[in-house]
């Protein structure tokens, strides 16, 4: 089953990974790139917002517990800005607190197939 990446306009879907753990970002990058996605990384919410201003992704994955700006504030800021409010958000966190404004959530540790399936569904639902 090919769950990836190509949007309706033929462009490769872009995913922004926001997580303070380098190993998690690395693992997610490998999974997404192997499936054909373009990946950008940020180590906290503030860096994620800066990255989004430079180039808007088709999907954002974020942790909840991070320094500088946690995932909940990050999501709140995305949702309150008309330019970013509709970006699908996948929370990937070991924290059981569910970000209400996120589209869906996966726990850590996660299965690569579940991660790819959730990403593909969110990108597809967004019209990608």
Give the residues covered by each predicted segment.
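Short acidic/polar segment at the start of the alpha1 helix of CheY-like receiver
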Residues: 21-25, 98
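Helix N-cap/capping motif at the beta->alpha junctions
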Residues: 41-50, 71
């Amino acid at each position: 089953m090919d769950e990836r990446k190509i949007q309706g306009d033929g462009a490769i879907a872009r995913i922004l990974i926001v997580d303070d753990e380098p190993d998690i970002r690395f693992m997610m990058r490998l999974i997404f790139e192997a499936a054909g996605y373009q990946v950008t990384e940020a180590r906290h919410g503030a860096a994620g917002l800066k990255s989004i201003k430079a180039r808007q992704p088709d999907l954002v994955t974020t942790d909840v517990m991070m320094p500088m700006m946690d995932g909940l504030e990050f999501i709140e800021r995305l949702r309150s800005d008309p330019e970013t409010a509709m970006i699908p958000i996948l929370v990937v966190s070991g924290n059981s607190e569910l970000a209400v404004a996120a589209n869906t959530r996966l726990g850590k540790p996660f299965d690569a197939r579940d991660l790819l399936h959730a990403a593909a569904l969110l990108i597809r639902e967004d019209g990608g």
